[in-house]
Every structure is written in structure tokens, then in C-alpha cells.
């Protein structure tokens, strides 16, 4: 059954301020920034812009809350998180509507995001009992010493979420942090903060004050969070450029980071692939629904010479028929806009460079698609675009575009294929299409990526680690490793008595030191 979407006026957040310490707070300087509807380019309103002083106050509140939150029992923490999950499911339609209104993503495709965020909250609530240490054997009899470890929360964690699925990332990525006994400050994307503010309204009375905080803002807010001494870890879903800035700042303070960054992901098709399934997957893997704005998009498609022409022609047909750009809040829209005018200009510049470098434009290439219906005037739309005859040296084959542009490359030699696939600085995902298990296993071992699909694209599975290598990131999400990443391990040694005579013996054996 189709969701019952409320009028947009009823779904939008009432508050446009900062949310911390369990209250809505006016920025110290009352600084505001405009936020837009990308489908139309029109201003929705002005949102609070957190300053360094605001960040200081929010971090102090989060740290104060941490001192109590870390002492909550497993059952208490699970109760808070499961209540939050239930609220997200209850308000899925309105969250999707706000999200689409402020991101340009089609509302019909965004409803599932509330379920994904709620599932993550339930999942990590269930993993809280795994926050246990180990009893470890030492080099000498156990009657002399007891060795064990404990896992402890880190403190205040800052999580920066991306503009393609803001409230989903906010809800899902806070889960591991608070499950681990930490408090969290979420920085929404500056282009699209509204769904995160609505999320704060929904959770305002769920968690104790200061446990979950949401600070909209720009570069000053991000810099202040990264460099604040009481913020123990910083996590980003975003661009490589932003990730490197955060890592430099955090590294100077010996602060831990977790990064899910960009991708230039390869879809590799062998001659024996199921052609019908391959065609559908190539079209789906580019994530044209949200205008290609996904770090996991399979934007480089490597088609074997023997199937290249047939697959390319059929993919073009599917894309032309399957993606109808339009107003994001219209449930019949199947392709959204880009997030901003700057993003639209960037994508169009990549399209221009591809033409200049000799790639063959097969479909798209402009700001809207007459075959699929003209989007709303003023929106930041770009047609679903496919280039063929792409060579590895072209910009569109090497750099992440983060837009609806697919590069199709022809291949025949497997060793050369692998060299080209691995020639970028990215390593997030890869897809391999073949019916032969030996071929799949051979390619899995050779493709440089943190996550590889075989005969599939773009799917995430809770409890299966997701993340990249090389410039695509550090750390793994959506699994128990994500939970552990927001804890510290403390090692404990207890002298059980009567073991003082061991000191000289152990020192002589080189098995202890006094450093």
C-alpha cells in the first residue's frame, strides 16, 4: 500500500535552531543560512548556523550527559534505542517527504530510509551485550595474576552526515555511538538540514538531554567539532577532500576518525553473464533515482567486447524509459535533482570534458530529458547520461562525479582489465557479473575494493561490514566492528597475591618491562 503523505507544511520541522542539551537553542550570533528546494531552486527558509561558541556549549552539554549515559544499564540503553526506532517507523512518510523536499530525491524512494535507520537502531541495541572484554592467559600460572580486558565508551563523538540521505545516515549512524555508551553530535549537511531537524523534534523527549544533539552549520561548525578537545572521535560520510581536511585536523590532536568517502566503482561484465539481469543491474547500479548521488554507484561499466553492443543498447533503452525526472515530492517522480546549483555545474563540466576528450555521448548530456518529461523550471536537474568509447585516461573514468553520468568501457584482456579497474585512487565497491564461480573468485581476489557484489549491485546488509580502502575511507560500518570502533579497550592486570617474587624472574626472562 502506498504511504499516506501529509501536506508538506505539516511535515516540515517547526524548529530551525540548534538542538543540544535536550533543548532548542538560538545561535549565539543568531547567524542563519538559507536552505533550498533543489527541485525548484526556491528558498525554503533560513536555518541556524552554529558558530565555534555554539559548538563549545553543545560539546560541554554532550560531555556532561556522557558522564551519566555511560553508566546506563544494557536494558536501559536498549529501551531508549528501540523507542527511537519505533518513532522513526511511525513517522516514515513525513520524514521521507521532508527529505525529498530538501534534497531533491524522489519521495517514493525515500520512505524506506526510515526503516533502514530504525533497523540500525534495533540492530545495535541488540549488539550491546557484545560489549564485553576477555579473560586472557598470561605467561605464568593463573594463581599469580589475572589478566582481562574491558570495553569502555570514548566520550563525545561527532558524526557528519552526507546530503544524499541525511536523516537515514543521522538515525542509522548514531546507533552504534550511543549503543557504545557515548553521546553524539550530528552535523547535518549544510545544503539539506531539514530532515535532521525533524528527526531531533521526534526524538526530543526520547533520550536524556545531551545524549543526541544536532548542530546545523557550515565550515566553522565542522572545524570546531573536529578540533574540540572533548570530542574524542570524528566520523564523516562525504567527499575525499572533506575527509582529508578532517583527518589533518583530527590527526594533529591524535584524535580517531572514521571515514566513508567517495568511490569510482567498477561493474565488470563477463561474456557468460545473464544478459537480462545484467542490463537491469547496470541501470540500477548508477543510482539514477537520486541523480547518481551515491558513493557506491557503479559509475564505470566494463563490458566484454562480445556483449558490449547489445548490453549498451538495452541499458540505454531501460534508462530512457525508466527514469522520469520531476518534482521530488511527487510520488510518480522516478528521478530526482542534484543537491545544488554548484553540483549541477560540476556535473555539466564533467559532461563537457568527456565530449572534449572524445567519449561518445549515447544518451542524456543536458539539464533535462524531453523524452521523460520536463522537470520543474529552476531545479538542479541533469539528464541520466551515458558515455561509451570511454578510455581510462579520461576524467570521467578517473574522478568521482557524484552525478548521473555513467562511463562504459570495452574490454577483452583480463589482465589489462584488472589494471584499469584498480588504477584509480578509490576502492569502495565493485560488482562482478558471471555465471562461473571460479571466475568470480578470481576477480574478487584481484579487485581493490572494500565491498564486492557478485551478480548484484548497491545492496547493503546489516551485520555485513561496509566500507572502503585507499581514498574511499577508513573503518567499517553496519556491523559489530562499527560498534567496537566507538569503544576503547582497557587492559587490566591483577596481582592475586604472593606473586611479588616474580618481578625479578620475569624481568630476567624479558617478559615484563617497567616502561
Swiss-Prot record:
Its EC number is 1.2.1.3. It is an enzyme of class 1 (oxidoreductase). One of its GO terms (molecular function) is aldehyde dehydrogenase (NAD+) activity. Pathway: Secondary metabolite biosynthesis. It comes from the Eukaryota. NAD(+) binds at residues 238-243. Disulfide bonds: none annotated. It catalyses: an aldehyde + NAD(+) + H2O = a carboxylate + NADH + 2 H(+). Disruption phenotype: Leads to the accumulation of stipitaldehydic acid. The active site is at residues 260, 295. Pfam families: Aldedh. Aldehyde dehydrogenase; part of the gene cluster that mediates the biosynthesis of the tropolone class of fungal maleic anhydrides. The pathway begins with the synthesis of 3-methylorcinaldehyde by the non-reducing polyketide synthase (PKS) tropA. 3-methylorcinaldehyde is the substrate for the FAD-dependent monooxygenase tropB to yield a dearomatized hydroxycyclohexadione. The 2-oxoglutarate-dependent dioxygenase tropC then performs the oxidative ring expansion to provide the first tropolone metabolite stipitaldehyde. This is Aldehyde dehydrogenase tropH.
Amino acid at each position: 500500500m502506498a504511504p499516506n503523505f501529509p501536506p508538506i507544511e505539516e511535515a516540515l520541522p517547526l524548529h530551525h535552531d540548534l538542538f543540544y542539551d535536550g533543548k532548542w537553542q538560538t545561535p549565539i550570533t543568531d547567524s542563519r543560512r538559507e536552505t533550498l528546494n533543489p527541485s525548484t531552486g526556491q528558498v525554503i527558509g533560513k536555518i541556524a548556523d552554529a558558530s565555534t561558541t555554539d559548538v563549545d556549549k553543545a560539546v560541554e552539554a554532550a560531555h556532561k550527559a556522557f558522564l551519566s549515559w555511560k553508566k546506563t544499564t544494557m536494558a536501559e540503553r536498549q529501551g531508549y534505542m528501540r523507542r527511537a526506532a519505533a518513532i522513526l517507523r511511525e513517522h516514515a512518510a513525513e520524514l521521507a517527504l521532508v527529505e525529498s523536499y530538501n534534497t531533491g530525491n524522489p519521495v517514493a524512494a525515500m520512505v524506506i530510509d526510515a526503516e533502514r535507520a530504525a533497523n540500525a537502531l534495533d540492530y545495535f541495541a541488540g549488539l550491546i551485550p557484545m560489549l564485553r572484554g576477555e579473560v586472557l592467559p598470561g605467561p605464568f600460572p593463573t594463581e599469580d595474576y589475572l589478566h582481562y580486558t574491558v570495553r569502555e565508551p570514548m566520550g563525545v563523538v561527532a558524526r557528519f552526515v552526507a546530503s544524499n540521505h541525511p536523516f537515514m545516515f543521522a538515525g542509522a549512524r548514531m546507533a552504534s555511538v550511543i549503543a557504545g555508551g557515548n553521546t553524539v553530535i550530528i552535523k547535518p549537511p549544510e545544503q539539506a538540514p531539514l530532515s535532521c531537524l525533524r528527526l531531533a523534534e521526534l526524538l526530543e523527549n526520547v533520550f536524556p538531554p545531551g545524549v543526541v544533539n544536532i548542530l546545523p552549520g557550515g565550515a566553522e561548525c565542522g572545524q570546531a567539532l573536529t578540533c574540540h578537545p572533548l570530542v574524542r572521535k570524528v566520523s564523516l560520510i562525504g567527499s575525499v577532500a572533506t575527509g582529508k581536511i578532517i583527518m589533518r585536523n583530527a590527526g594533529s590532536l591524535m584524535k580517531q576518525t572514521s571515514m566513508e568517502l567517495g568511490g569510482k566503482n567498477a561493474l565488470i561484465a563477463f561474456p557468460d553473464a545473464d544478459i537480462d539481469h545484467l542490463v537491469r543491474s547496470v541501470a540500477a547500479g548508477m543510482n539514477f533515482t537520486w541523480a547518481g548521488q551515491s558513493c557506491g554507484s557503479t559509475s564505470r561499466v566494463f563490458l566484454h567486447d562480445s556483449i558490449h553492443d547489445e548490453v549498451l543498447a538495452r541499458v540505454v533503452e531501460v534508462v530512457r524509459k525508466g527514469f522520469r525526472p520531476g518534482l521530488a515530492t511527487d510520488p510518480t517522480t522516478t528521478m530526482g535533482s542534484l543537491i545544488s546549483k554548484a553540483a549541477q555545474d560540476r556535473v555539466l563540466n564533467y559532461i563537457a570534458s568527456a565530449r572534449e576528450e572524445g567519449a561518445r555521448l549515447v544518451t542524456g548530456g543536458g539539464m533535462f530529458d524531453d523524452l521523460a518529461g520536463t522537470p520543474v523550471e529552476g531545479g538542479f536537474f541533469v539528464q541520466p547520461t551515458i558515455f561509451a568509447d570511454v578510455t581510462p585516461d579520461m576524467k570521467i573514468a578517473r574522478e568521482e562525479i557524484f552525478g548521473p553520468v555513467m562511463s562504459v568501457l570495452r574490454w577483452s584482456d583480463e589482465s589489462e582489465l584488472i589494471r584499469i579497474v584498480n588504477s584509480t585512487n578509490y576502492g569502495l565497491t565493485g560488482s562482478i557479473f558471471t555465471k562461473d564461480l571460479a571466475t568470480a573468485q578470481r576477480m574478487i581476489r584481484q579487485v581493490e575494493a572494500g565491498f564486492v557484489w557478485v551478480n548484484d549491485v548497491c545492496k547493503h546488509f546489516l551485520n555485513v561490514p561496509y566500507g572502503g580502502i585507499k581514498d574511499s575511507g577508513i573503518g567499517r560500518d553496519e556491523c559489530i566492528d562499527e560498534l567496537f570502533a566507538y569503544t576503547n579497550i582497557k587492559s587490566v592486570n591483577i596481582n592475586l597475591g604472593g606473586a611479588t617474587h616474580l618481578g625479578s624472574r620475569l624481568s630476567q626472562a624479558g617478559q615484563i618491562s617497567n616502561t
